[in-house]
Amino acid sequence: MFARTSTVLTIGVATLGLLATTAGAAPTYAVTATVPVGQTPMQVAVAPGGAVTYATNSGANSVSVIDTATNAVTATVPVGGGPTGIAVTPNGARAFVVNTADRSVSVIDTATNTVAATIAVGEFALAVAVSADGAHAYVTNGVESTVSVIDTATNTVTATVPVGAFPIQLAANGTHVYVTNSSDNTVTVIDTATTTVVDTIPVASHPSAVTATNDRAYVRSGAEMSVIDAATNTVTATFGVDGTMGGAAVTADGHTLYVVDSEGGAVTVFDPGTNTEVTSLAVGGSAGGVAVSADGARAYATSQNENTIATISRAPGDATLPR
């Protein structure tokens, strides 16, 4: 579920023209490793420096810790029942893991790979995101139609925010959290500075996955993706995607969008500048979650059928145009 964000670069017309004349080959994408993990991996998160990834194993009640340099599991951390969502703090010191079956969040100390705290949340908790400053973690409670706000310094729930009907996923950028409400076809926007709902955005039926930069949020509703302008909180475009289920992750620079095709066991790569498909890569049956490294060089996707994490590497072209 869930990646770091940054402001998208803007440049002058003259500079853009120069880059356009010198641009060469487009980036290429390939699956460069497949790592066995625990039973039924659901979601994956990348540490800020990119050296480690974490995968939740729902069928094994554990989190696999993967060294991205060697593509090997270096630790397995026992957590609560049915772990699903996971997010890492910006300093990399903690990983927050949602245990859906236990209605709890396990807080992993990443220095020791041990659980430092367990926090009670709501029923059918599923997803978690951490604010850009690392001060708070946000957890969806589907049955209660709320989001729990956790103070990461004290590991306590300090607020519960009512949102739309049956929230299942969420994503944070520098200032807001975007929550997909699957039963009333909306996205709730929470201001992270005030912990209040500032907008509710209608989208297509049964929104699920969401990912965001400081400029845009991308919301999946089955085989359709909605693009939300973060400045106006309006849907500015929609486009089709492969399959109807699976996660989504956009790189911090906004240049690449990865969308999981769960039914097809693949990850589709999109160019957000044109909202068009670039390529599709096989990653394993019942692909689920996807996350990207902070530098955008790699993405990681789960295969629930094969109990693996696929590494997707992006090789840059001769030049990459900012958008």
Where are these regions (language model features)?
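Predominantly soluble domains enriched in secretory-pathway, periplasmic, or organellar proteins
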Residues: 4-323
